[in-house]
C-alpha cells in the first residue's frame, strides 16, 4: 500500500497547499466541489461553504481546476502521462479513443 501512497499523498498535498479548487466525483456519480482542507489514509476533508468528510473508497476521480506541480520521491518521476487537465471522468475514454485514432 505504501507504493500507492507515494503518488496519492504528494498530489493531494499539492492541492491542499496551493488551495486549488477541485471537483471530486464519487463512485455513485455525485460531484462535490471545494478545496482540500486535509486528508489522511482513509478520508479527505473538503471545504466549501461547509466542511465535508469524504471517504476515499467512495471517490472515483479528483479533478483540479488548474494544473498542479506535484513531485513524487519514486524513481519513475511521479507524474502520469495519462492525466488530461479539465476533462471530466465521462469524457476521458472518448479523448483516449480519439488520440489513438490520430
UniProtKB/Swiss-Prot annotation:
Biological processes per GO annotation: regulation of DNA-templated transcription; regulation of RNA stability; regulation of translation, ncRNA-mediated
Annotated PROSITE patterns: SM
GO CC terms: cytosol
Function: RNA chaperone that binds small regulatory RNA (sRNAs) and mRNAs to facilitate mRNA translational regulation in response to envelope stress, environmental stress and changes in metabolite concentrations. Also binds with high specificity to tRNAs.
Polar residues: bias regions: 70-96
Name used for this protein in its record: RNA-binding protein Hfq
Family: Belongs to the Hfq family.
GO molecular function: RNA binding
Keyword Flavoprotein: no
Quaternary state and interactors: Homohexamer.
InterPro entries listed in its UniProt record: Hfq, LSM_dom_sf, Sm
Stretches for region Disordered: 63-102
Domain Sm: 9-68
Alphabetized UniProt keyword annotations: RNA-binding, Stress response
Amino acid at each position: 500500500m505504501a507504493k500507492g501512497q507515494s503518488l496519492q499523498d504528494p498530489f493531494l498535498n499539492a492541492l491542499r497547499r496551493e488551495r486549488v479548487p477541485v471537483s471530486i466525483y464519487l463512485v455513485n456519480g455525485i460531484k462535490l466541489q471545494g478545496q482540500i482542507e486535509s486528508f489522511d489514509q482513509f478520508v479527505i476533508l473538503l471545504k466549501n461553504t461547509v466542511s465535508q468528510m469524504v471517504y476515499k473508497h467512495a471517490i472515483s476521480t479528483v479533478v483540479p481546476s488548474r494544473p498542479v506541480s506535484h513531485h513524487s520521491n519514486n524513481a519513475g518521476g511521479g507524474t502520469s502521462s495519462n492525466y488530461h487537465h479539465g476533462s471530466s471522468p465521462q469524457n476521458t475514454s472518448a479523448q483516449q479513443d480519439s488520440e489513438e485514432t490520430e
